[in-house]
Regions:
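Conserved HGGG/HGGXW glycine-rich cap/lid loop of the alpha/beta-hydrolase fold
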Residues: 2-41
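Conserved serine/cysteine hydrolase catalytic core
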Residues: 157-219, 223, 229-232
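Gly/Ala-rich beta-loop-alpha elbow adjacent to hydrolase catalytic centers
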Residues: 67-76
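Flexible "cap/lid" loop of the alpha/beta hydrolase fold
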Residues: 81-128, 163-166, 198
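Conserved alpha/beta-hydrolase fold motif
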Residues: 66-67, 88, 183
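Active-site loop/oxyanion-hole signature of alpha/beta-hydrolase fold enzymes
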Residues: 31-65, 103-116
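Conserved alpha/beta-hydrolase catalytic His-Asp/Glu region
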Residues: 125-174
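Glycine-rich His-Gly loop
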Residues: 8-11, 70, 93, 186
Length: 234
């Protein structure tokens, strides 16, 4: 049975980060969309408006599986109340609150980016946030991606330039946790999210990889997505 997937990237990257997994899913006979808000925007829209822009990028289909990577987890939770779906899968991201405000990043990370911003509030592109932290770079998988310089340069060219102020925003989530949801954890960065997902009774799959697993290990990511989807929807 073929499945319909909508793979949503976080605003810090582009849909190209999902493309290796999207291609693998298509090879396996599934239908896939990778909406990219920044394709049609000269500058990134506000976080609180991101879901509305996503909806404009999604071709109508019958109850897709919404998959959010990293900071896209609140986006798929918000999408679920506007777009009938079969289930939600979060890949290496936060577990959004059941309702109420959801910020693009955790408070500790917000404090960190304030420390690396230029005097006008401009931030480096996301791939350079942790340039001085080899361990974090390794957990994310940027060191692996950088082993292919042309591919890494192409990846970086697409990353948006954001300011600190952009992150001082929230999406107001309506009740969404009646929708079946699961978590695929790819890196130790989201150990806390896996604990919260289990507390809520979600299925959790642990892959031994990096944050950029959908980019770097598309075959394993695809298998996990398909298996979890079928387990949840029956």
């Amino acid at each position: 049975m073929s499945l319909d997937f909508v793979l949503v990237p976080g605003p810090l990257v582009r849909a190209s980060s999902w493309e290796p997994t999207a291609q693998q899913l298509r090879k396996s006979g599934h239908n896939v969309q990778t909406p990219d808000v920044l394709d049609n925007q000269q500058s990134p829209p506000a976080w609180r408006a991101w879901t509305s822009h996503l909806l404009q990028c999604i071709t109508p289909c019958h109850e897709p599986i919404l998959v959010g990577h990293s900071s896209a987890s609140p986006l798929v939770a918000d999408l679920a109340r506007r777009l009938p779906c079969r289930c939600i899968i979060i890949v290496d991201g936060e577990v959004p609150p059941s309702r109420g405000p959801a910020s693009p990043i955790r408070p500790a990370l917000f404090d960190f980016i304030r420390s690396i911003a230029a005097s006008d509030g401009t931030l480096p592109i996301w791939s350079r946030w942790f340039a001085g932290d080899p361990r974090r770079t390794s957990l994310i998988g940027l060191d692996l991606l950088a082993r292919d310089p042309p591919a890494f340069a192409e990846f970086e060219r697409g990353l948006p330039s954001l300011s600190v102020d952009w992150f001082d925003d929230a999406i107001e989530l309506a009740d969404w946790d009646h929708v079946p949801a699961g978590l695929i954890q790819c890196s130790p960065i989201y150990d806390h999210a896996a604990l919260e997902a289990r507390r809520r009774g979600w299925p959790v799959v642990r892959l031994e990889g990096t944050h950029l697993h959908p980019t770097l290990e598309p075959v394993e990511t695809t298998k996990a997505l398909v298996s979890m989807s079928r387990d949840m929807i029956g």
